[in-house]
Swiss-Prot record:
One of its GO terms (cellular component) is cytoplasm. Residues 201-210 have a biased composition (Polar residues). Keywords: ATP-binding, Kinase, Membrane, Nucleotide-binding, Serine/threonine-protein kinase, Transferase, Tyrosine-protein kinase. It comes from Dictyostelium discoideum. GO terms for molecular function: ATP binding; protein serine kinase activity; protein serine/threonine kinase activity; protein tyrosine kinase activity. ATP binds at residues 283-291, 304. Residues 25-70, 79-107, 127-200, 211-236 have a biased composition (Low complexity). It is found in: Membrane. SMART domains: S_TKc (SM00220), SH2 (SM00252). This is Dual specificity protein kinase shkD.
Amino acid sequence: MKRFFSNLFKRKQDQNSHIKQINGPTTSTPTTTPTTPTTPTTTQTPTPQNNNTNNNTNNNNNTNSNNSNQQKKEQAQASPSTNQTQTPSNNTISTSPTVTTQPSFTPGVISTSKLTTSPPESPRPPTSTTNTTQPSTTTTTATNSTNTNTASAPTKTASPSSPSATASPNNNSNNTTTTAATTTTTTTTTTTTNANQTASVNHTSSDQSLNAQNVTQTNNNNNNNNNNNNNNNANNTKPINPNDYIPLDFVDSTPKVDNNQPKRKASGPPEILPEEIDRTDFLGQGSFGSVYKGKCRGQEVAVKIPRKQKLSLYELTSFRHEVKIMSKIFHPNVVLFLGACTQSGKMQIVTELCQTDLEKLLHNDRTKKEFSLFRRMQMAKDAALGMNWLHGITRIVHNDLKTANLLVDINLRVKVTDFGFSQIKEGEEFQDKAAKGTPLWMAPEVMMGNPYNEKADVYSFGIILWEILTKEAPYSHHKDYDIFFNAICNEKERPPIPADTLPSLRHLIQTCWDHNPQNRPSFSEILFRLNEILIDCAIDFDDGRKYWKEHFLVPKQELQEEVEWSDFEKTLKATHKQLNLDYAPLKELLVQQSHQTVQKTKQVVTMERFDKVSKWFGSFFEPNTGIETIDNINKLSAKIWFHGDIVREQATSRLSKAAEGAFLIRLSSTEPKTCPFTLSMKNNQHRRIQLIDENNFTGFKIQGKTAVYNSLIELVEKCNDYPLLVPCPKFTQETFNPYDPYTN
């Protein structure tokens, strides 16, 4: 390299002496050439002040310049061994080192020789929109000595990372000739100009010089915008109109990223940088690690910090593979995986944020009373749906399925979390001994270190079902791990199931935690069993359960927890086989608006409402007794004093507007099976009406009174216990729709 630069400087001196022999001594214009190891060389001279006054002189000199070029061509043919570019100049010569040796060429003549070898590859692809060049061997800037104005504008030789181009301001673009040619080692560009023009000789690769033909760009006074001289483009700046809309300044909140880090791919697992995650509140801690509430890219998220941060190369590769799998799982009952930071020592998992988890709901003294068994079984079904998706799509074994890993969102939908990522999970300690996972929910084969499959998650789900049923923690009496291990793995101990448990639910729990994994059902079968259990939980009567299972539970299909009224009415008509039966009053009692669809006007019959109406009036869906029951509903609905399903506060409000001695009869939701109706009177008096069903006799009486009546209508008409004088009228715009009982 040292010898290369010494030879280069020697050739430069020979070139300068040769120029002096041709043109004689000249006066060089002062030039400032800032040079740094990493920035391009810039040659600057004073900008001409009265450029337009020299246009005529420049045009006259153009002919002489062209003749001079022709003479030089003839001289070059006589001496082809000349190895330097000769250009008359009184200006500064700016040079930069070349990478290759120069073959012989004719001075002043564009080289047309073919490439003998392929040019060197550019380290970066050429960019046509930037004024940058590859490292050029020689850049010569000159002005005609015969011109009276020898000052020229600054000439820039751009950075060595882009295609070659020399920017030179000139208003006389029609007098400019710019050419570029390529050879195996050197490309020479000779430009002949007048007093305000420059001659540039640049070396470019073959691909770059094809795109560099006829390129001469001008620099405006601010040296910011460049226009093409050959197209005569002027520098036009649109004036700012004060009436124009000016947007607010954009404040870039993007974290500053180190450019030395490897670039992230546009596709693949979502890699998140540590500086993009902002942790705020601490949410909890488990076998996975610590969980925080935080923000990532403007979104509220849950941030999980694994305990295990130092991974081997194999573990880190496996972890990144699991991240890729997690990013492809989308299901409403699986917590949405948003991304992960996989840098060793800074590993973090980012997921959607949920409000709470099932463990807190079941064991909190306030919240555990708010959920019926039917609602809790719906939560169990949500968890089974998520696990069935994981087992069926990705073949993922959770290994740590428990109520704490079943998150609950604001809509009380349960979502499975903390699945996968086995490389960064550590065993939760139970007297310092455990495999990966939590021992209380762990299958025996996992605790014993035997091979296991997805049926280990089924065992854990059996413990979860027991916990959902009883709202108690499993194995609370065990404190020692060795005793616990022996009880579960050898003695096959399981939590006690309450005696009043539904037979269908008892059977499912027992099969799920069976000691033999082969006897445990799959989650697909569990879902079907849970559909049956949901019907058993929602409907108390055996004939009602049978009716719903026969008509609205299709094998291998989803359970219809809500049935549109039109479909429900068809099944009733098919059962009763009587065309002139009026179902309108029954519809007012049964129909609710759907909670499962966005379409609020959709009228449906739910399993819970079906059960409640059956308790109030009897089996209206039976082929024989159902017709009589519907007839009784129609007669009762025609009475002015029957107000249907309204609450106590609403009954008091209506009676306050009525005359003295006013009363009404409403449906009771507290004990609909034993006391289906309530007598409400003025002055905030409410008495339950008890159903008498014994010895093949059905009748009614006011609770606390002795008189028994054959029907509710007879009770109202013949009651002597209370002065039922004035029936409280119903409002004309009011219906019995229980979904909106406050309509007045």
